[in-house]
């Protein structure tokens, strides 16, 4: 009887320990941790589930998941650009997810058609110009920037970065390879200087008068406009009379080898909620994917815009063609 009593006490202690054990999830992410920390802290407060972040380069993180196989700690892979998410799905990193909440909160064109990954913020890429040189009446479309009237006025970020590859991919989907190549060749003919390594330097070149126009992700402009010296930078929403502004995403999917799929789905659903979407928009100055959430007040002043509703998975499937086209057009 004494042995049974001791055994029951031990089992009770184990049971209590298990009840008090904190559930955990691990995100492998190429996003900056400070963008996510306020959201995952709120998630922990609401659910009691702790979220660990492992940050790094997207390609290296995908390779790590491949190498780790079924032993991977990753429950969620999160990154920027639909092209990279498409690559991850193509490498069989993600599992399919069934969720009415994600279905409701995220527009169909901002997620994988097979529900392997989901957009969590929108990134609009459009025209920015120097108000010292031009007015918004001077602009219309991305394609118009190939016109010789802009010779010596255009600055661009390199095509070696995924953002411009995705923009080119969206144009290939709309116009085909040959017509898009004509446009990109026109851009190159109109360059004022060599291409830049990032959007911020291209914007600074426009502000300083080194060139007059560029194409960038809007959150880079929003960050620069915190400094009054860049007040001469103005935004123009491209292609409002046809397909709309090119949008890309940051997003995430559940890793196939995850042992915590239920909680991982719960976290993705939370990231698509109004609370998280508003926090995310405040932190990164990107646009929410949830219609009822509001962007940062500094970018609300730019007004509403029509966006291209191509399914963003095509930005991945057409990426190889975009790279080839850039090479053929001389876009470094």
Where are these regions (language model features)?
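A structural signal for short loop-to-beta-strand junctions that line the ligand-binding cleft
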Residues: 72-77, 95-127, 143, 153-156
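Ligand-binding pocket segment of bilobal, Venus flytrap-like solute-binding proteins
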Residues: 159, 163, 170-238
């Amino acid at each position: 009887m004494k042995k049974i009593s001791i055994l029951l006490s031990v089992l009770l202690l184990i049971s209590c320990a298990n009840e008090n054990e904190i559930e955990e999830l691990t995100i492998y992410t190429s996003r900056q941790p400070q963008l996510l920390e306020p959201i995952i802290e709120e998630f922990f407060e609401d659910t009691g589930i702790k979220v660990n972040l492992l940050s790094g380069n997207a390609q290296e993180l995908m390779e790590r998941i491949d190498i780790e196989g079924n032993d991977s700690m990753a429950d969620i892979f999160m990154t920027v650009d639909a092209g990279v998410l498409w690559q991850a799905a193509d490498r069989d990193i993600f599992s399919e997810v069934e969720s009415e909440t994600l279905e409701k909160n995220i527009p169909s064109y901002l997620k994988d058609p097979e529900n392997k990954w989901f957009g969590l913020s929108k990134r609009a890429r459009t025209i920015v110009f120097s108000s010292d040189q031009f007015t918004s009446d001077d602009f219309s479309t991305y394609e118009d920037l190939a016109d010789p009237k802009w010779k010596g006025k255009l600055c661009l970020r390199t095509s070696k970065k995924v953002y411009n590859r995705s923009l080119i991919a969206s144009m290939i989907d709309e116009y085909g390879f040959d017509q898009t190549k004509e446009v990109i060749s026109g851009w190159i003919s109109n360059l004022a200087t060599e291409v830049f390594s990032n959007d911020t330097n291209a914007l600074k070149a426009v502000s300083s008068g080194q060139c007059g126009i560029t194409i960038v992700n809007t959150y880079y402009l929003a960050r620069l406009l915190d400094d009054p010296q860049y007040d001469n930078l103005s935004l123009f929403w491209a292609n409002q009379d046809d397909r709309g502004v090119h949008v890309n995403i940051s997003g995430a999917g559940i890793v196939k080898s995850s042992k915590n799929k239920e909680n991982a789905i719960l976290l993705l659903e939370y990231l698509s909620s109004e609370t998280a979407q508003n926090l995310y928009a405040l932190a990164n100055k990107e646009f929410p994917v949830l219609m009822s959430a509001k962007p940062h007040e500094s970018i609300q002043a730019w007004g509403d815009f029509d966006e291209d509703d191509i399914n963003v998975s095509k930005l991945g499937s057409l990426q190889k063609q975009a790279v080839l086209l850039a090479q053929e057009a001389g876009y470094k």
